Every structure is written in structure tokens, then in C-alpha cells.
Amino acid sequence: MKRCFLFAALMTALSTNGQSMDALLKSVEQNNAQLIAYKKAADATKSANHAEVVMDDLELGYNRLWGNPTTIGNRHDISVSQPIDLPTVFGTKSKVAKGKDALADDEYLVRRQDVLLEARLCYVDAVYYNALINELQRRCEHASAMSAMQKKQLEAGDISIIDYNNMRLTLSNTSTALIQAKAERDAVLAQLKVLNGGIDISVTDSIYSPISLPENFDEWFETVCASSPTIALTRDGMTLGRRQLALAQQGWLPKLSLGYMSEKTLGEQYQGVTIGMSLPLWSAGKKVKQAKAEVAAAESIHTAAIEGLKSVLSSEYALTKGLIKAASEIKSTLLSTDNRENLQKSCRAGEMSTLENLVSLTSYYDAVDKMLSSEREAQRAYARLTMYLL
């Protein structure tokens, strides 16, 4: 329930048009072939875990002994016995099985997290290519209009063939960039299709919603630790290790067996209840020592996992913050320095040459490209930063 709440909260704050992202991730989770296989494997593992928490098999015995001399007849023995764990041991075995179930679930959630992150990164890339394609289409339209105007000016003798050819090259380069961007977007959508189990999935968004970074990293990191399947895997590993240690310590307890036995000879028969006990004198000590070592190792792994995750997320947090600032500054500059209409008017009025127009537009276009790229990288960094909340 807690994970569902965190997932819903994350989807509300995501930086890529929430509902569209939410629907995409849900679709991938339902249809991804790897996740379906991992889920089946986890269920099979849990079934195997509980198959071990049963009573030992019933033991049946039959003896036929020939008498010597023959006058004493033969002896027939029949025995049935059932080994029985003490209730304490049986309860601990059940807890160990449940601990293994938790690990199987954690391993599935780690794989789920990786698949959903891959899908989310593809979504970020698709939005970037949509925005880039829209921008390149506008540039093609502008270059096409300028080329048509330059052709008329060339025919009128107002410009040289060099100016006209420069504009044609600009149009050709822009058209090529547009074709390349569409091909790269198709590749991203093809990858999304694979992640979605072979089902087509479309992405129409071309604008990112603003990223809202947590103000207090340490407090936010505590939330991540509480919900991260990677940390849960090591935490549940510690819990399982402690339960296995308790089971090993209970290995010193005797094991009982109850049964029935019948002995039949010539003219005589004995039958009744049998009670047995096995004493673990030799193996229990080594098992306890091994279990203690495994608990210590699990605790070290858990501590290292938390420290490693904090280091990674701290780096991603700083990177995301820097990329957001860079994209914001470029966007602010572009809004205050957009001279495209003025450049087009000046060129038509003959106030500036085609070369001057192209140089000015190229500077502006380079800034737009950097802005789109910075936004994309910021979104990708944010996706990696929040992947543990998926």
C-alpha cells in the first residue's frame, strides 16, 4: 500500500506530462515480456520455499526373518514412524520461508524498476525528438520561404548566385537534420514497443513539465530508503539471515518421532507405540557458526548499499540541479533575444545580406538546440534520481 502511494505521488510530480507518463509505465508493466517472466519465476520460487515447510516423510518398515531351527517359525516386523519437529522449530521454518518470499518479491521489484526506468528514459527521448522535429520543421519552412524569395531576387539580379546557393545549402542541411531526427524518434518508439511487449505505443508530448527537486536531500533520501527495492533486498536479506540463525540455533533441540510397531512370531504377537529421539551432537555447532557469519555479511552489505545509494543519488541530485539551471538560463536568454522576424524583414528589405542572415539565425538555432539538449539531459538525470520511487 505504501509503495502504491509513493508511486502515485511520484506520477503526480513527474516532469513529463504526468498522466501520459503514468499510462505508459502502467502499460509497460503489464505487457513487458521480461517482467511477466520474472513474475512467474518469483511465484515459482515462493512455491518452492513453502514446499520445504512440511513434515518429514512417513517412514515405513517391514522385516521378514527366517527362524533357525525351522520349528520356531519366522518373525514378521512392521513399523510406521513419523518424525516430528518441535512447534518452535516448525514456526521458525515458516518464518524462513516467508523471508525467502520477501527476497523473491524484492528481486522482481528491482527488475521492474530497471525496466520502468528504461521506459521512462525512452519517453524522455521521444519528447525531446518531438520538440526537435517541431523546431526543424519550422526551420525548414523558414528556409524554404527564404529560398523562394532568394530565387526571385536572383532572377531580378539583386543577389549573386553565391547567396542563393548558401540558402539552398541551409535548406538541404535542415531537411537532412529533420529526416535524421525522425529516424531517431522512430528508433526510440521501436524500443518502447519492445518494452511494451510488442504493442505499439505513441508519444505525442513535446514539452516537459517543470522539474520539482526536493529541497531537503537528506529527508528525501530517507523516503527513498524506505521504498527502494534495492535497499529492501538487502534489508530483507538481513532479516532472513537472522531467522536462519535462529533456526540453526534451534538445531540443538532434539527431534522426536512417533510411530507404531508390530512384531509377530509363531504363536506370539507384540504391537504398540514407538517413540524416538534424535540428538544433533555433531552438526549443529558448525551450522550456527556459518549462520552468524552470514548475518554479519548481510549487515555489511545493507550498510554499504545505503551508503552507495546515497553517494549515487547525491551526484545525480547535483547534476540534475545544474542541468535545470543551464536549461533555464538558455531559455530565458532565447525569450529575450528572438530576432527571427526582424531578421526576415531586414533580409526582405535588402538591409542585410543572406550571409549575415544565416550567421545570425545559426547562432539562434544553436542556442535552441542547446536548450532542448539541456532539458533532455535534465529530465534523464531526474528520471535516474527518482527511479527508486517507481
Identify what each model region corresponds to:
Residues 16-59, 84, 92, 158-159, ...:
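Bacterial Sec-pathway N-terminal export signals of envelope proteins
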Residues 114-227, 316, 323, 342, ...:
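Periplasmic alpha-helical coiled-coil/stalk elements that build and connect Gram-negative outer-membrane
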Residues 37-49, 111, 115-138, 145, ...:
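Amphipathic alpha-helical coiled-coil segments
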Residues 98, 161-170, 292, 354-362:
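Short, charged, amphipathic alpha-helical segments
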Residues 1-24, 29, 390:
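Bacterial Sec-dependent N-terminal signal peptides
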Residues 58-95, 204-214, 256-292:
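Small/polar, glycine/serine/threonine/aspartate-rich low-complexity segments that form flexible
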Residues 26, 30-36, 43-57, 79-96, ...:
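A glycine-/polar-enriched beta->alpha junction
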